[in-house]
Amino acid sequence: MGDDQMSAREIRYRELASIEASLNYVAASPERLKTYTFDPPAGTPRSNAVFEPHRVRIFDVRAAAPELDREGFALVKKATSVQDFSDEDAIRNVYYPEAEALLLDHTGAERVVIFDHTVRRRLAGAIDRTSGVPRQPALRVHNDYTEKSGPQRVRTLLGAEAESLLQKRFAIINVWRPLQGPVRDAPLAVCDAGSANPDDFVASDLIYRDRVGETYAVKYNPNHRWFYAPDMTEDEVWFLKCYDSNRDGTARFAPHTAFDDPAAPLNIPPRESIELRALVFYGQ
């Protein structure tokens, strides 16, 4: 993107409504970052990552008209027919096909494979990934996949056909929807991929009982441009680009995080949301 075009976008962003809030970025560490998804052996910390709050400006996305391949995210209005998101069968048999059709239509891709989902229900003081506790909003800046783990996810899920698929463009896109609106508690903030530098991303091990995944923690950069959707409703979804194999200037990684909105009133309903993760194959 040319400097003139970028400058025009910067001016337009500064004209948008915005708030200031604290986002948690990873602190510098000489060690390889590791986080366990289960209770680790005695004496081993659940995570060795340290996060530091930084005040940032977060713009109202609704007037920004972001594009998935430019900023790395998009806000789309689309209702769902699913009424009960505690029903796993409804999620897999109804919601998955709805989201697949929505992604195909929005991206123009040839094939979409939705491979998992997470329902989050915030509980005050709860720690994420604790046994018996619903998954909690992730209050730290991160990206779900890395240069290494993106292709590896395709190999793990699709086996023998993976290598031929990896010869063409593919992406990993999250589909994020609130289950109750308007969202005032722990809304999602997303970062313009074009405002992040490669050095901002820190590869981190995510340790499961049967495998080790890799995600990106993110270091603070004052140039990051953040966006959120005020009072997001259950009829809206975020598309978040977590990986893209294209290296032609297309948005590849869009950091994101939940955050505490300082303007939110007291005693608001706790956030409930669902996110799907999808492999998106473009056939080119």
Locations of the language-model features?
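Non-heme Fe(II) oxygenase catalytic core, chiefly the N-lobe of the double-stranded beta-helix
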Residues: 9-216, 220-230
